Amino acid sequence: MRIGVYVCHCGLNIAGVIDVSALEEMAGELEDVVLAREVQFLCSDSGQEGIIKDIKDNKIDRVVIAACSPRLHEKTFRHVMEKADLNPYLMEMVNIREQCSWVHADDPQMATQKAFDLIRMGVAKARFLRELSATSSKASRNVLIIGGGVAGIEAALNLAEAGFPVTMVERESTIGGKMALMNEVFPTNDCSICVLAPKMTEVQNHPNITLYTYSEVTDISGSVGKFHVRVTRKPRFVLEDKCKGCVDLCSEVCPVEIENPMNYGIGKSRAIYMPIPQSVPQVVLIDPDHCVGCGLCQLACPAEAVDYEQKPEEIEFEAGAVIVSTGYQLFDASRKKEYGFGKYPDVITNMQLERMLNSAGPTGGRVLVPSTGQPPESVAFIQCVGSRDKTVGNEHCSRVCCMAALKNSQMVKERYPGTDITIHYIDIRAAGEMYEEYYARTQGMGVDFIRGKVAEVYAGEDGRPVVRYENTLESRVEEEAHDLVVLSTGYEPSKAAEGIGRMLNLARRPDRFFASAHPKMRPVDAPVSGVFLAGCASGPKEIQVSIAQGSACASKVMQLLGTGELEADPMGAHVDPDKCIGCRTCVEVCKFGKISIVDKKAVVDEVSCYGCGDCSAACPVGAIQMRNFENEQILAQVRAATAHKSQCPFVVAFLCNWCSYACADLTGMSRIHYPTNIRVIRTMCSARINPEFVLEALKGGADGVLVAGCRMDECHYIHGNFDAKKRMDVLKEIIKEIGLDPKRLRTLWISAAEGERFSNTITEFVKELEEIGPIGSELKREYTATGLEEVAK
């Protein structure tokens, strides 16, 4: 083995504190190191060229780069390895800038010692580095889109135009979602169906789109590139290829009246009906729960499209990626009994008002008081019904309700100028483009706004609904009767979402909508590879945001499936079948469902493995390992650190790449100092930290161990830090049982932005360890190493 060590000056960023020449000399004396060199700027063109020349001239087969953070330049130096015809994963970076020179400028001597310790740890790991290469596999270019609302439509058209085959599955009998039911849309007051209908028709007619309406996804298995999908098409009892959409002929003869689900209880339809006039496809359906089987519609249909014997149809296909655009459902206003919905006919929801305002809706665009059939002279809107409300379990804001109420109040005012309109609100949230102007315009039209919660709605002596409310701006409780009360109901995840979430193993937010991989950096990526979230599937949002997310999802899919092949990250998990005992521990630990048991052995889906390492930490026999973060590699770092204990107390820290290690980097960038007593080992996730690593550090002489990961509920692998915390909590009890002070193991759950807190934690931990004393000092008998060794076994 021939290892080359390179130490970067980084101008004075490193060399201004650390004795770089001494590092070069000490590194050159390490076992297996055949070349050690200090360079002004390793990342410069000349620096990179020098490394390439050295590798070729000296037949170097491993490289250690002591410079800045691997989060900054790891890819840079991997490319250098490739140019030198060396496998890029035979290089290890050592962070002596952000986590050494920048945080220990007040103690150059110990900073130099710490830097050498880190280099020694890097060389120890380098001895166990293996050649890694990305593997590729064929991927289906077909894309499954679940949900045919505006977000799904936008994604489908973007993909289809780019040449990708798309299969759209919509559980309702028409695509278009809630937008297709609305009258006009804010803030421009465009006719909703006028702008949406052309896109709906384009979806139906596009040669690259296969559309299944009145259908549900019943099973999804497999993983990115090769999802196996099963869809059930429910019977319409009308043949799609024969129906001409001439609904009047069949509907007129039907003797049964029903409530059209698209009208939310306003008006009536027949048992054979068209969902909305602009339905896509233009095909009627029969409601089997109310149809009496009289046969009149079948006799009236000139196309012979009615088929009472139609059965559910099962369809199976492959998809390379999935876009979840399942939308939302409206809060059931009857759950707020104090508002009288379902009890008083003149208390309706905002969506019912939308259907009244729609010229193609059940009332032909007229707003009518249900009890009288006449236009209202006074209307009250009550905001936040079923949102921002702990009593119904919905503490979140539904984001759109304020603007929807403003829009509908404008519509009522325009059609019935003499109508008095009052909006009862907690806060008006008008934060989008042109929203504040829209709010001002509504006020200018004479709409009254009263800040405060509504206590109840009850029937007055004349039968009209009376609103009892607080006026917080005037500190009064008042009552007022209205002809019509409109409840602005909140948004909840759609009925389909729960099943889809189970099939795809999607995480949920506290508001029960699907959680993205990261709310800021990866807002449309699901935590599962090959799955993307668009529109209200990931929470309430406006139409324009849903459209933007549909386009974003399409772009992500194009990047993923553009070549028809998928490249697996070589640093995922892999199983040694000779060691595996088929215990299923890894299967249960992997929340992403990427491990299965085949022939009594664990098998990892390496193409879609996330690389968190949770499975590896849980494996009782060490059969499953994380490439580049294998047990022997990390243990080599631990032993190299503790074998030359350069100060007391001595702390070994395991930091996750995404938050705690990034936080340590930020601490350095902010020049926030902390004691030199800490030696950091990076893992991708805190879940990778095997209790064996901690015990090995303590057995080797470390006075304390710090395990740090992302804040709870913010782990980049969703569940990783929860599993890490459980393991460390148990380990603290074990440490206590063998006679050591459990305070020697400290955990920290921190964001990447909390540099001051990171520094304070290190400082406090070192002081605490000074009070406890050197490792084993609290024991009456000398059995520390023996006890730890037994526990490790």
From Swiss-Prot:
Q: Name one GO biological process term.
A: methanogenesis
Name the positions where [4Fe-4S] cluster 2 binds. Answer: 254, 291, 294, 297
Cofactor field: [4Fe-4S] cluster; FAD
Q: In which pathway does it act?
A: Cofactor metabolism; coenzyme M-coenzyme B heterodisulfide reduction; coenzyme B and coenzyme M from coenzyme M-coenzyme B heterodisulfide: step 1/1
Instruction: Kindly list the places in or outside the cell where this protein is found, as annotated in its UniProt entry.
Output: Cytoplasm
**Where is [4Fe-4S] cluster 3 bound in this sequence?**
580, 583, 586, 619
Which sites bind FAD? 147-170
Reported EC number(s) for this entry are 1.8.7.3
Q: How is the cofactor bound?
A: Binds 4 [4Fe-4S] cluster.
Q: What class of enzyme is it?
A: oxidoreductase
Q: What is this protein's record name?
A: Ferredoxin:CoB-CoM heterodisulfide reductase subunit A
Q: Which organism is it from?
A: Methanosarcina mazei (strain ATCC BAA-159 / DSM 3647 / Goe1 / Go1 / JCM 11833 / OCM 88) (Methanosarcina frisia)
